[in-house]
Amino acid sequence: MNEDSSIAELEAFLEEYPDTRFMDVFAADINGIIRGKRIPREDFSKPFEKGANFCASAALLNSRGEAAENHPHGAHDGDPDIRSVAVPGSLATVPWASVPTAQCLLELQEFDGKPFFGDPRNVL
């Protein structure tokens, strides 16, 4: 999906759900555990346009939530970010949320657009 169609997906969603205040954006780590963050409405467009920053080491935690130090993304190098972009068709409401909230699955990429080695979606 290109950037224009991603933005169109977001705009259509917000037209249907105009009171949405937050969006939970998440990606699976190397163990299949969901890691993510909640973003405010003013940041909704980031994962649908150029991409939003995402902590690279969050995708590389072990099953106990501990950081491994034998990879290029961790505390030893300042815990750098990577790029995250919305997975087309994954934007949905969170009906059980106490305030109007959306959720969206992310794909993790290097800043040059190459797939991030720690994103299980890039392995399959």
Predicted regions and their residues:
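ATP/Mg2+-dependent ligation/transfer catalytic cores
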Residues: M1-L124
